Structure formats: structure tokens, C-alpha cells
């Protein structure tokens, strides 16, 4: 192999490597933009949940939370992702997880109300998928996301343990699971503060 041919080969390899690097940087920038848009949308939706919960409390004259504790929102207790910052698989990027993910569920597993309350949202969006939000009074809510189907409508009063939907993988989801959130006085709290005997899967 001649020196000229070798230089030409190295030049081609360098150009290919530079293109790969440029593509990676472009993808990283695009990912950061998408992540920023998602976080902004989720914050807006969370504010709407708080508003609806407080509006319901004002209309009903009930400014105190329903009594009693929380039960598991599905039959599985296998938690695959806890509340808080988590790695997303892209270098340098993480996302703030506002609840817990419960795995080892399928497309027929029932999602049930962790506490009695009133349905304030039963809807779909591209991030949460099919989701249901139940108000328990005084700015306290529970949220059930990525459902394959929803079993309740806005305004429905649900008992603790009543089916609100069927688990699935709608919205931004890598597989069947139930994303579950609890808020108290409009603030996100760790569901594992109340849900005991969980199996750690992270």
C-alpha cells in the first residue's frame, strides 16, 4: 500500500469520524430541547392538577383531605424506578421523576384508587399517555399514568380500591408499567413513604 493511498484512507476515516461526532452533538442538542419541552409541559400539567383539586375543594366546601391511608394502586409491589432524579441513558442527561414506576404488570392488570376521592382528570396526552387523577381534598391527589384504558370519568366519586383503569404502556413509556404519583397540599411527595413492603427493582 502506497503512502498516498494510506493518507487517503486516513482522511476518509477522519471525515467519517467527524460526521459521527457532529451527528451526536446535533442529537444531543435535539434531545435537550425535547427534554426541556417535556419538563415544561409536565410542570404546566402539574399546576393544572393542583388548580383543579383546589377548585373542587372550594366548590364542595371540603377543605380537608379524606381520612385514611393509601393502598397499593395495583397488585404488583415491584418498583422499577423511585421518585427523584434518574439517568435516562444519554450521557449527561437526567430527568426528575415525579413519582414511582411499578413494574411486573401487563395489559390486563387493574389500576385501583389508592384512596377514596373524586376524579378530576381522565384524559390522554403524549407524555403521560392515558392517565387519571383523583382528588382527595385539600390539594391532595393521586395520579395513575400510561394506562392502556381508563375506567372512570371526570366527576366520578371513587372508593378506595375501585378500578380506575388498566395498566399499559401509552405515552412516553418503554414497556407496561404503572407510573404513580401522590401530592399533598399541591406538593409532590414520595409514595414509598406510605406504600410499604415494596420490592426494590432499581
Regions found by a protein language model. Name each.
Residues 1-67:
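Alpha-helical oligomerization segments with coiled-coil/rod-like character
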Residues 68-202:
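Catalytic cores of peptidoglycan-degrading enzymes
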Amino acid at each position: 500500500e502506497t503512502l498516498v493511498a494510506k493518507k487517503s484512507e486516513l482522511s476518509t476515516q477522519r471525515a467519517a469520524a467527524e460526521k459521527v461526532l457532529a451527528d451526536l452533538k446535533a442529537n444531543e442538542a435535539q434531545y435537550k430541547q425535547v427534554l426541556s419541552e417535556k419538563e415544561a409541559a409536565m410542570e404546566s400539567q402539574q399546576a393544572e392538577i393542583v388548580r383543579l383539586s383546589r377548585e373542587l375543594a372550594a366548590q364542595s366546601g371540603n377543605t380537608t383531605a379524606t381520612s385514611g391511608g393509601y393502598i397499593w394502586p395495583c397488585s404488583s409491589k415491584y418498583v422499577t424506578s423511585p421518585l427523584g432524579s434518574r439517568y435516562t441513558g444519554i450521557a449527561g442527561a437526567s430527568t426528575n421523576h415525579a413519582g414511582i414506576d411499578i413494574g411486573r404488570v401487563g395489559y390486563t392488570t387493574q389500576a385501583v384508587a389508592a384512596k377514596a376521592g373524586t376524579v378530576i382528570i381522565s384524559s390522554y396526552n403524549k407524555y403521560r399517555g392515558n392517565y387519571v387523577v383523583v382528588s382527595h381534598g385539600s390539594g391532595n391527589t393521586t395520579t395513575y399514568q400510561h394506562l392502556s384504558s381508563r375506567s372512570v370519568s371526570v366527576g366520578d366519586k371513587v372508593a378506595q380500591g375501585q378500578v380506575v383503569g388498566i395498566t399499559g404502556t401509552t405515552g412516553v413509556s418503554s414497556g407496561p408499567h404503572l407510573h404513580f404519583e401522590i401530592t399533598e397540599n399541591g406538593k409532590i411527595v414520595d409514595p414509598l413513604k406510605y406504600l410499604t413492603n415494596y420490592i426494590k427493582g432499581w
